[in-house]
Structure formats: structure tokens, C-alpha cells
Amino acid sequence: MIENRRGLTIFSHTMLILGIAVILFPLYVAFVAATLDDRAVFETPMTLLPGTQLLENIKTIWVNGVGVNSAPFWLMMLNSFIMAFSITVGKITVSMLSAFAIVWFRFPLRNLFFWMIFITLMLPVEVRIFPTVEVIANLKMLDSYAGLTLPLMASATATFLFRQFFMTLPDELVEAARIDGASPMRFFRDIVLPLSKTNLAALFVITFIYGWNQYLWPLLIITDVNLGTAVAGIKGMIATGEGTTQWNQVMAAMLLTLIPPVVIVLAMQRAFVRGLVDSEK
């Protein structure tokens, strides 16, 4: 008996199209708003046809920022990139070395240390964030790149993922390295790192987007407008009280913040997908 799957195929494709429409429609509305002038963006209902002011709106926020005493948006983008890249490199480095030590070094209470790291996943961010802010304040790292990045470089999730991957590597690799007289760090550099390329690519993409999209942490740590990040800076563009929000410029800023993560994903999509597939095996 041959099943007729035509109905299922039509249904699945219909749901896929609806899902894409739900995701893309708000982005399209934001794009249209970014192309309008100050008058057209406040018309009710707002037009869904693109205007001609996109480059002008981008130029305005890129050079002058939005709002009183606002930093140029290019500076916010630069701060966001420095933050995201630093968090990504730091988190991967710390997590890989931590997992490597837990898996291949024999020392007392190593499993206890691992579970102490892992148990932090059970704590909500809201529980940990204010004690972390107090520590950063006591260390005089407010309004600094160090305060923005260092607390976010530790990751129980990344450590756990690398530990699980390292545990799948055969013991024969370790024995062969020992016979060749390789030191632990040489074994890590020459064998473990090359075998971890796909996992590194997947984690790089995920961690970069995580760092780029940070909103609450920069708001708590940074008061200097010249150290503000793009995602948190958009919030400052929205007026409160009787002020008027320039929504066309806010939407233009939002579109600019999409560019770096999209570029990273497109540039590394093959390695990213391969890393996710390999991690499931």
C-alpha cells in the first residue's frame, strides 16, 4: 500500500510559508519605517510601501546619533563588536581549557568542580546579575570594556558541550601522544583543536550573537555614552514622557544592528550547520 502524502506535503509547506511570513513581516515593516521621513512614519495607517529616506536616516544616526547627548551610532556599533568578539574569544578559550582539564587531567574533586560549574545553569540570570554588578563595581570596572566583557566570558553551557565532545575522543589518541612525548598543551594544540573545528564554528556563531544582543548587562554597567552598545543604545532613542520618538531613525538603527550577526551567520553557515550536526552524533 502506497501512502498518499500529497495532503501532508501541502499542509507542511503552507505552515512553512505562514511561519516565514510571521517572522519576516515585522522586519519588512521596520524596513519600510526606516525609509520614511518624519511625517510619513506617523501617518495612520502607516504605508507599507518603501520610501526614499533610508540613506538619509542612516546617515543622520550614523554621524549624529539620536537624542540629546547621544553618541554616534557608528561608535555604538564598534563598542558592540568589541564586546561581542571579546566575549566570543574569551568564552571559547576559557570553556575549552576548562573542559580539557576536567576530561584529561586527574586531580582531586574534579567532578565536584564540574558540577559546581554546571549547577550555575539552574540559576536564573536575574539571580546572578546584581551580585555580579556589585563585584564589578567593587573592582572599579564600571564604564569599561573589561566590565562589559569579563563577567560574560565564563559559560557553563560551553564548558559542558566541550566536555561532552572531548569525552567522545578515543583514549588511543592520548596514549599515542604520550608515547610520542607530547606535552598536554601540545596534545591540545595539535590534536584536540583540529578535531574541534566544527564545534568551534558552531559555538563561535552562537556566542557572537549572544554577545552582540546583550541588552541588560550594558545598561547596568555603562553610564558613559561613548561606551554604549548598539542594542542598548536603541532603547535610549525611544523618548519618554512628552518627548517624540523618531521611529524612522530607530528602525534604521535596528536594521544596522542586524548586519553583523547576519554576516557572521552567512560567512560561517556551512561550518555552523556541520558543527550542530556533529555535536548530535
From Swiss-Prot:
GO terms for biological process: transmembrane transport. It comes from the Bacteria. It is a multi-pass membrane protein. Residues 77-268 form the ABC transmembrane type-1 domain. The chain crosses the membrane at residues 16-36, 85-105, 113-133, 142-162, 202-222, 247-267. It is found in: Cell inner membrane. The keyword Zinc does not apply. The keyword Transmembrane helix applies. Keywords: Cell inner membrane, Cell membrane, Membrane, Transmembrane, Transmembrane helix, Transport. InterPro entries: MetI-like (IPR000515), MetI-like_sf (IPR035906). One of its GO terms (cellular component) is plasma membrane. Belongs to the binding-protein-dependent transport system permease family. UgpAE subfamily. Part of the ABC transporter complex UgpBAEC involved in sn-glycerol-3-phosphate (G3P) import. Probably responsible for the translocation of the substrate across the membrane. PANTHER family: ABC TRANSPORTER PERMEASE PROTEIN MG189-RELATED-RELATED (PTHR43744), SN-GLYCEROL-3-PHOSPHATE TRANSPORT SYSTEM PERMEASE PROTEIN UGPE (PTHR43744:SF8). The complex is composed of two ATP-binding proteins (UgpC), two transmembrane proteins (UgpA and UgpE) and a solute-binding protein (UgpB). This is sn-glycerol-3-phosphate transport system permease protein UgpE. It comes from Salmonella typhimurium (strain LT2 / SGSC1412 / ATCC 700720). The lineage of its organism: Bacteria, Pseudomonadati, Pseudomonadota, Gammaproteobacteria, Enterobacterales.
